[in-house]
Design a protein with these regions (language model features):
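Membrane-interface interhelical linkers
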Residues: 1-37, 66-93, 134-140, 157-159, ...
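Glycine-/small-residue-enriched transmembrane alpha-helix faces in small-molecule transporters
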Residues: 1-60, 96, 100-104, 147-150, ...
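C-terminal-most transmembrane helix of multi-pass membrane proteins
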Residues: 2-18, 63, 260-304
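Hydrophobic alpha-helical transmembrane segments of multi-pass membrane transport proteins
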Residues: 34-41, 45, 73, 92-107, ...
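Specific alpha-helical transmembrane segments that line the substrate/conduction pathway
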Residues: 57-67, 98, 105-134, 170, ...
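Helix-helix packing/entry segments at the starts of transmembrane helices
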Residues: 61, 117-123, 181-204, 236-272
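Transmembrane alpha-helical segments that form core, pore/gating elements
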Residues: 70, 128-129, 145-147, 152, ...
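Hydrophobic transmembrane alpha-helices of multi-pass small-molecule transport proteins
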Residues: 123, 130, 137-156, 170, ...
Length: 304
């Protein structure tokens, strides 16, 4: 039996085809849920490192350790050779976005509450979701989820002004991550995760000039280095891989709308792990978000 051929000309082995089939039976919303949970576990580890390492060093450790994992796991450079000029430009752009986005995010949370940074980050996803809300039903879903997130997050306009600069920069870069991430997820074949890994290697190189110096103290303390690796796995490997698996089967607008569930996950995790019980306003916000996501209906991915 001949092996199935990819657009790149590489063959899909029966084992790889079987793995794809098993993943295809998992609802894309499940991958999104995994990404959402680890979206908040990673920053919790990173905050602990801020007391021992420079913020830029923590950001570099996150990207670099994720790049090492992808290099050992996927050997992503194999996917770069067959790419055309456009595909390589996309990888370079995504790598640059990942490097600067992760840096801007940590510079923001070092100066502002995490909830404020997260709420500002959601503004970009609202724009992407609105661009794809082509039906009254989906427009209503967008209104419900936006109102729900506003009720949950309660942005406080306090903190260092520079923190807001970094937070809005992170917001813009997160939008680009979604756009570019969808592009590589929908280029055909099973190589989306490999292309993501290649972009992460580019990100690690790009962030080295401003991040390596701040990370050097960790190389003399194995516990710090291990914690940095944990941040990379929890913040960049698991959630970004899960994003790729979800993006390959969800339109950009639907994926953006589902990001409204991130504050819901944060509230639930806070209640279970930290005993931070939600207020009546939190419960109302969660209800609106869940109703909005349930109301939304997937549309053909014409915006891609």
């Amino acid at each position: 039996m001949s092996a199935e051929r990819l657009p790149t000309g590489r063959a899909v082995t029966p084992a790889a085809s079987g793995a794809q089939g098993r993943l295809g039976r998992v609802p894309p919303q499940a991958f999104f849920g995994v990404s959402a949970v680890f979206h908040y576990l990673g920053p919790s580890l990173a905050v602990l490192l801020f007391a021992r390492l420079d913020v830029l060093g923590v950001a570099w450790l996150r990207v670099a350790s994720a790049a090492v994992v992808f290099a050992l796991w996927r050997r992503p450079w194999r996917r770069v050779r067959p790419l055309g000029r456009g595909g390589r430009r996309t990888l370079l752009a995504l790598g640059a976005v990942l490097a600067v986005m992760n840096t801007a995010f940590y510079l923001a949370v070092d100066r502002l509450p995490l909830s404020t940074v997260g709420a500002i980050e959601f503004l970009g996803t609202v724009i992407l979701a609105a661009a794809g809300a082509r039906t009254p039903r989906n427009a209503a879903a967008l209104v419900l989820t936006t109102a729900g997130v506003a009720a949950i997050t309660a942005i406080r306009v306090t903190g260092q002004p520079l923190g807001f600069v970094f937070a809005f920069a992170n917001c813009a870069l997160f939008m680009l991550y979604i756009v570019l991430g969808h592009r590589i997820a929908n280029e055909g074949g099973p190589g989306g995760i490999d292309r993501l890994g290649a972009a992460m290697l580019i990100a690690a190189v790009a962030a080295t000039p401003w991040g390596l110096g701040g990370a050097l103290p960790a190389f003399g303390h194995p516990a710090l280095l291990l914690a940095g690796a944990g941040v990379g796995v929890c913040s960049s490997v698991i959630p970004y891989v899960s994003d790729q698996l979800a993006m390959a089967r969800l339109s950009r607008a639907t994926f953006s709308l589902m990001l409204a569930l991130l504050p819901v996950f944060a509230t639930v995790i806070g209640a279970i792990v930290l005993r931070q019980l939600p207020t009546v306003q939190d419960v109302a916000g969660i209800t609106l978000v869940v109703l909005g996501v349930a109301l939304h209906r997937e549309q053909p991915q014409r915006e891609e």
